[in-house]
């Protein structure tokens, strides 16, 4: 019979109490504490190797005499996932300890560095000004862990990573704690500051479960009680360390309920700590009461949800036991007896900041508000250059010209191009101004091609929104798309290497040739061979990837040589094939694609996609039927661009899909994609060998598009 507890064991309550621990909840610890210890050791080693600021030694980290923090807070994690999430948790500890000593603005910058590192990773070791940048070091530090998590469980890993960034790093310093007057207000803030939502996503990843939004809503009251106990437990046991640190910091920020009670109620330290202790016990009892009510109201809970609820309490208790014994909160006492080993500057010792006194009314630097991280976008410099010639007519407003541009740019994006730029930059180390210029060039060309593609394909939707030409009309959209090509040329001329402009023109020519064949086959109802199709893809899709890689190669100050350029071209060629065939496959397979562009939209367009080409060549008997459908569709569309005439009937699409599935074409296309994915991975290895640098960032890009977990 399946039980609640699969991976953890009891901790003796009397033994725990003898250490000063006073939790009222049962304590459990993961059986594989050794995995958590190894992950902590690796996290500390990697921080020292990649970041190299010494903080891995100054932070208390996750170890303790009674067990690893990861083994207590992830008690029911699958063993093969425990190491990854403990690594991330220990990284959070080091990062948190570091930020506690930084002035407010520097702490914000440090959060931003780590948040960016969680987006992609870095793997560069070459010595240059860019390689020494802290954000690049952080990317290198975190990359292998992120890649490992994605290889274990890509969907949950991405959810966990995004939550870690957006629900913790991007909000943790965003409020002035000294403005708060009530415990409820403080706990609401600490829920964000402590990253509770991000933490539960890590628990879900570890347990390999998915808790729905509805289930989270129903369990929220009891989880909120447990979270309050968790936060206050940390405050209780960390108070002495935080108070001592604040006396030695130029810009002290105490985020602790003990200080809240001292400040708002005029209590002494001992009185305030005792009040926090009482509240911890109260919230633990509240959790137990609400849990029993929840079970009574929901007697037929699925096992995974009951396990999740029980784990919540065990995490609360395990964290308490660890906090009562961990070096992170208590090692400072040893430092007091060994002044020579202190990691703090002795010059500030004994200085008490009046802002930390009970009842102090002065506002700390926490009153400064953090601004959300924003991605740099195209600046106004992309408009027409001002002409200082009185003999030339004054230019009209560019509002009408730029409206379609701004519309397509505002659409949601999966960020693949930005990820690819980051990945290539781990090898090429392009200086930031030129790198930003190249990003803008690629964005211009990509968005221009989207506008034109939608017009040429008569697509009504783009990323779930009305296509640009359906909002602004075909003529205006074409005009704006053409102007974006002009802007791209203007920006390329400003790059340092003169070869960049020739590269741009070469790849644009290639792109238009590829697109011409795609349109030609559709209009003339001709079926290309697989070889002809791949040649078209190499031109149309591969051109954009090659252009990006070549522009960055030309602007790189650390990489040169024809061999490297050839390897980059080969990787981009394979990546372009993988990307395009995957797009063809997902258009017919993916629910997400249907939501974004419409069900099997490629069939509406009469597009010669890879699966369809394979079907038409391998099953001549069905060729006449499908070509007849396309011929009739083309005839209907030519009578007028009405939505009824441009869309195939749903039944017709389902019939074509039945032919594709019945002929095993979708399965063979998936096999082709997996072969291409392996080939791209092999080409990345070739570049890593040639450049002498591993690049897990590029593998993360590939992993985000992986079809290894796709099943038919």
Swiss-Prot record:
PROSITE patterns assigned to the protein according to its UniProt record, in alphabetical order: POLYPRENYL_SYNTHASE_1, POLYPRENYL_SYNTHASE_2
Stretch list, region Terpene cyclase: 1-332
Binding site for substrate: 96, 234, 238-242, 328-329
Sites where the protein binds isopentenyl diphosphate: 414, 417, 446, 463
Binding site for Mg(2+) 4: 453, 457
UniProt: Mg(2+) 2 binding residues: 96
Protein family per UniProt: In the N-terminal section; belongs to the terpene synthase family. In the C-terminal section; belongs to the FPP/GGPP synthase family.
Function: Bifunctional terpene synthase; part of the gene cluster that mediates the biosynthesis of betaestacins. The bifunctional terpene synthase btcA converts isopentenyl diphosphate (IPP) and dimethylallyl diphosphate (DMAPP) into the sesterterpene betaestacin I. The C-terminal prenyltransferase (PT) domain of btcA catalyzes formation of GFPP, whereas the N-terminal terpene cyclase (TC) domain catalyzes the cyclization of GFPP into betaestacin I.
Listed name of the protein: Sesterterpene synthase btcA
Organism this protein belongs to: Colletotrichum orbiculare (strain 104-T / ATCC 96160 / CBS 514.97 / LARS 414 / MAFF 240422) (Cucumber anthracnose fungus)
Lineage: Eukaryota, Fungi, Dikarya, Ascomycota, Pezizomycotina
């Amino acid at each position: 019979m399946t039980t609640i507890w699969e991976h953890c064991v009891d901790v003796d309550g009397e033994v725990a109490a003898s250490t000063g621990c006073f939790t009222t909840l049962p304590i459990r610890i993961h059986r594989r504490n050794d995995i958590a210890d190894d992950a902590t050791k690796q996290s500390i080693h990697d921080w020292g190797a990649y970041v190299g600021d010494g903080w891995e030694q100054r932070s208390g980290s996750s170890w303790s005499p009674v067990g690893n923090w990861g083994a207590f807070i992830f008690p029911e994690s699958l063993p093969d996932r425990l190491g990854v999430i403990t690594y991330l948790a220990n990284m959070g500890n080091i990062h948190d300890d570091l930020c506690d000593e930084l002035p407010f603005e520097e702490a914000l910058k440090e959060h931003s560095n780590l948040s960016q590192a969680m987006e992609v990773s870095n793997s560069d070791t070459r010595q240059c000004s860019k390689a020494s940048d802290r954000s690049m070091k952080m990317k290198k530090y975190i990359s292998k862990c992120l890649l490992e998590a994605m290889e274990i469980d890509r969907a949950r890993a991405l959810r966990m990573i995004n939550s870690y960034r957006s629900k913790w790093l991007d909000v943790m310093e965003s409020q002035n704690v000294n403005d708060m007057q009530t415990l409820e207000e403080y706990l609401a803030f600490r829920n964000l500051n402590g990253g509770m939502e991000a933490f539960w996503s890590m628990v879900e990843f570890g347990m390999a479960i998915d808790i729905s939004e509805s289930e989270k809503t129903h369990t929220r009251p009891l989880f909120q009680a447990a979270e309050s106990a968790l936060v206050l437990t940390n405050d209780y046991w960390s108070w002495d360390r935080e108070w001592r640190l604040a006396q030695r910091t130029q810009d002290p920020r105490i985020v602790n309920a003990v200080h809240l009670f001292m400040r708002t109620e005029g209590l002494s330290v001992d009185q305030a700590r005792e009040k926090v202790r009482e509240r911890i016990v109260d919230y633990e009892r509240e959790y137990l009461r609400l849990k029993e009510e929840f079970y009574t109201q929901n007697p037929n809970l699925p096992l995974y949800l009951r396990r999740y609820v029980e784990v919540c309490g065990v995490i609360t208790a395990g964290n308490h036991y660890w906090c009562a014994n961990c070096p992170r909160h208590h090692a400072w006492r040893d430092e007091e007896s060994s002044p020579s080993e202190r990691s703090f500057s002795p010059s500030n010792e004994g200085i008490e900041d009046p802002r930390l006194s009970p009842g102090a009314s002065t506002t700390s630097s926490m009153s400064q508000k953090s601004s959300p991280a924003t991605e740099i976008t195209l600046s106004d410099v992309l408009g027409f250059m001002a002409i200082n010639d009185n003999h030339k007519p004054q230019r009209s407003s560019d509002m009408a010209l730029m409206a379609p541009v701004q519309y397509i740019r505002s659409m949601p994006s999966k960020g693949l191009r930005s990820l690819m730029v980051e990945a290539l930059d781990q090898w090429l180390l392009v200086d930031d101004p030129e790198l930003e210029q190249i990003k803008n060039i690629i964005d211009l060309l990509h968005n221009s091609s989207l506008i034109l593609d939608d017009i040429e394909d008569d697509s009504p939707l783009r990323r779930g929104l009305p296509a640009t030409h359906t909002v602004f009309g075909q003529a205006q959209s074409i005009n704006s798309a053409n102007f974006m090509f002009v802007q791209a040329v203007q920006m390329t001329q400003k790059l340092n290497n003169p070869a960049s402009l020739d590269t741009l023109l070469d790849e644009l020519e290639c792109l238009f040739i590829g697109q011409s064949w795609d349109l030609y086959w559709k209009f003339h109802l001709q079926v290309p061979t697989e070889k002809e199709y791949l040649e078209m893809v190499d031109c149309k899709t591969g051109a954009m990837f090659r252009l990006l890689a070549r522009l960055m190669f030309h602007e790189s100050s650390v990489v040169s040589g024809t061999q490297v350029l050839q390897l980059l071209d080969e990787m981009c060629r394979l990546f372009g094939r993988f990307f395009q065939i995957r797009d063809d496959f997902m258009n017919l397979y993916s629910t997400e694609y249907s939501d974004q562009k419409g069900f099997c939209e490629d069939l509406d367009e009469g597009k010669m996609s890879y699966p369809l080409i394979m079907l038409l060549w391998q099953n001549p008997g069905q060729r006449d039927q499908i070509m007849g459908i396309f011929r009739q569709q083309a005839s209907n569309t030519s009578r007028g661009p009405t939505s009824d005439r441009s869309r195939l009937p749903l039944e017709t699409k389902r019939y074509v899909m039945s032919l594709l599935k019945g002929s095993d074409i979708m399965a063979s296309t998936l096999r082709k994609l997996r072969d291409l994915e392996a080939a791209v991975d092999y080409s990345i290895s070739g570049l890593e060998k040639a450049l002498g640098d591993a690049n897990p960032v590029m593998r993360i890009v590939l992993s985000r598009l992986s079809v290894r977990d796709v099943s038919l």
